[in-house]
């Protein structure tokens, strides 16, 4: 067996047969195709197949894709065209598109038209939009609806909303949480009652744009500092919210200091502000100072200015000079009051400047019909100008009682015309009956010109001493002025009011 293996391995391996001519040609073609597929030659290159680079595939024509993407330039041109359409639409409304340059607006005219129609539904006209075109940059759903919904929940009236938006359209840009709610919370913290908050915002919507740490806080702090009671702050803000926007150094402090200069104490000024806070809105240079000068020109003494302002603060804000000239002419012609005495009339009752001609003549005619001479009427009016503002029916009843029950001489009324200012049933009748019962004979001044406590003390006397009889016929003009002012306020809507409503002056 070993011999057989040796014999098998000893024979050499036969050489391969040479390929036939046909097979050699086929092998060459196959090798050439394989080489060309693996590394195609680059055009223009003289190198062999191993160094050739692939050709770039040709760009497909637009017709070869169903979703051809526009270029950035095409997109920008489209946006510009749509913005031009929106601008043209705004221009047709009278809005200057240039005012909105750089502001992002709705992409289409249809969306912008929807926004304009919403603003029109709030009773805002095209003129309003032209006055504040930035309102057109507010989204209806993101900006306007939340703000309007919040104002409505506060209690802002629907009919007051258009005026609020015209005066402060910036509210449409506001954030309810960041801008509006803190202001409302501040007002409530100043004791403005919840149902008064919407009235405050309706009257002074600019308040919604104030910062809490700014003018609002400083103005209130100053008022409290001069004596305005803390519990009255809410009432002051409710009746005159504009005070929250007044700068202390430029408006409030100069106003207070000027009133101090004419003799008013700070505490008296604080009481005026508590009662009539709108006086802070009277311009110092164009109203207050000229009116003070006018009073002096028409015979009012400088030392009486403080009393006049305290009794009738509105005198600081009306068109006073022409009013004084008209009233002085009326008093001179109808009551024979001299120019000097006219100043005394204003000092004792500053409200006399608002008396209508009809009211004056009606009271003068009544007094002359009672038997007084015009010269006596003049004296009575100068001493007690309140006669010209009292209720006519009450005056008639008082005079009838004086003439029929008291049976006194008319000269006593000339000396003490304030008799007509006392209540018949509350004061005159009971005091007269007590004096008559005691058998006293006294003047009208002794009878009436004292407090109830003082009168009760007098009724303990057995006789009236000489010093008691020499009672001053003067009376408290401060009390009378307050009484007359209250009557005038009660009778403002009465057709028989002694004040001519057509001649009354109110803050503008």
Curated annotation (Swiss-Prot):
UniProt GO cellular component terms: chloroplast stroma
The entry's keywords: Chloroplast, Plastid, Transcription, Transcription regulation, Transcription termination, Transit peptide
UniProt superkingdom: Eukaryota
GO terms, molecular function: double-stranded DNA binding
Biased composition, class Low complexity, residue ranges: 28-49
Compartments, as annotated in UniProt: Plastid, Chloroplast stroma
Membrane-spanning intervals of the chain: none
Bias type Acidic residues, positions: 484-508
Sequence segments annotated as region (Disordered): 28-69, 475-508
Transit peptide start and end: 1-79
GO biological process, any: regulation of DNA-templated transcription
Family per record: Belongs to the mTERF family.
Function: Transcription termination factor required for processing and steady-state levels of plastid transcripts. Required for splicing of the chloroplastic group II intron. Required for the accumulation of 16S and 23S ribosomes.
Protein name as it appears in the record: Transcription termination factor MTERF4, chloroplastic
Species assigned in the record: Oryza sativa subsp. japonica
